[in-house]
């Protein structure tokens, strides 16, 4: 497939309109429209639905966009190699993850990686898991970390780890010596929970409903940092989180993690995702391997590599 029609197609798909693509490409709108029509005629497929508010991809168009995005990234990598800048000394690694991984774990891993590769730089987008998957699928980031309850389509899973939910509390808490807990054990204590919409809150609410209990949290917040600090400075407050989320902080802050045994709270997985079919540049591949090893040290043994 010729490069020019593919470039025009990619621009229209990303901008959603012929005029925006023409502006991006510095050509006339008619030139963009002609290239798209010729491409559809060549393939014998409709790639876009023409709508009043713009161009919407069809199912064949979605498939071609995935190919075109990989092609654009590969061309950039080749050009960088030809210019001699795609080295271990110069490269930005783009990441996306939910706050649960951005609060402590991923910043620590990136800092430790730079001890070995001081020329590495990072751009980290903190978004929800669904958005992180979409960003890596679109090629906007190199690597995504996500919490998942179901299989994720359209991306390559480089690593999948169990990510069960645990109860976080002060080491002096009455429940701190227990080997495991259930949601029923938490009813008598103040809770600090994430707001509805997070995977933790979703699974916690399901477990409570199945047990027929109504738990009203003392604190709710969309900020993991706020929830963690509340537990740290309280005597009896309990929060729920994953092991990887706070693995490097509990010891220094005299907090403990007690596993939750409710089956509903053990369904979550932590995934490392990359774009399907894409060959990452060398430094990104090194970081991916480093990240996987770090995750394996804090996750459950049942981890699978892609």
Where are these regions (language model features)?
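Short helix-boundary/capping micro-motifs
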Residues: 10-28
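A short LG(V/I)-centered, amphipathic sequence patch enriched
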Residues: 40-57, 62
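Alpha-helical linker/hinge and terminal dimerization helices associated
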Residues: 42-43, 64-86
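Flexible hinge/capping segments at coil-to-helix
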Residues: 87, 155-165, 169-191
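Central regulatory/effector-binding core of bacterial HTH transcription factors
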Residues: 90-152, 221
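A late-sequence structural motif
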Residues: 105, 256-301
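Beta-alpha-beta core module
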Residues: 153-159, 163, 225-276
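Secondary-structure junction motif
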Residues: 190-211, 242, 280-289, 298-301
């Amino acid at each position: 497939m010729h490069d020019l029609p593919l470039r025009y197609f990619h621009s229209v798909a990303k901008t959603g309109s012929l005029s925006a693509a023409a502006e991006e490409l510095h050509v006339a709108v008619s030139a963009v429209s002609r290239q798209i029509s010729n491409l559809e005629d060549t393939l014998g497929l409709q790639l876009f639905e023409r709508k009043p508010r713009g161009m919407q991809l069809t199912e064949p168009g979605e498939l071609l966009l995935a190919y075109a995005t990989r092609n654009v990234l590969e061309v950039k990598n080749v050009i960088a190699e030809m210019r001699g800048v795609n080295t271990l000394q110069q490269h930005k690694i783009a990441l996306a993850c939910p706050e649960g991984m951005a609060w402590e774990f991923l910043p620590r891993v990136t800092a430790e990686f730079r001890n070995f590769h001081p020329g590495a730089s990072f751009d980290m987008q903190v978004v929800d898991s669904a958005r992180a998957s979409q960003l890596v699928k679109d090629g906007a980031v190199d690597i995504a970390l996500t919490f998942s309850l179901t299989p994720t389509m359209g991306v390559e899973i480089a690593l999948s780890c169990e990510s069960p939910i645990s109860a976080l509390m002060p080491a002096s808490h009455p429940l701190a010596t227990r080997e495991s807990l259930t949601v029923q054990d938490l009813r008598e204590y103040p809770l600090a929970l994430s707001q509805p919409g997070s995977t933790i809150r979703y699974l916690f609410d399901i477990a409570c409903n199945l047990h027929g209990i109504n738990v009203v949290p003392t604190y709710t917040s969309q900020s993991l940092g706020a929830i963690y600090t509340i537990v740290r400075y309280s005597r009896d407050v309990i929060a729920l989180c994953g092991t990887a989320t706070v693995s490097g902080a509990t010891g220094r802050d005299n907090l403990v993690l007690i596993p939750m045994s409710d089956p509903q709270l053990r369904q979550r997985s932590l995934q490392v995702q990359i774009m399907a079919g894409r060959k990452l540049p060398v430094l990104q591949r090194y970081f991916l391997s480093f990240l996987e090893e770090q995750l394996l040290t804090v996750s459950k043994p049942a981890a699978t590599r892609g």
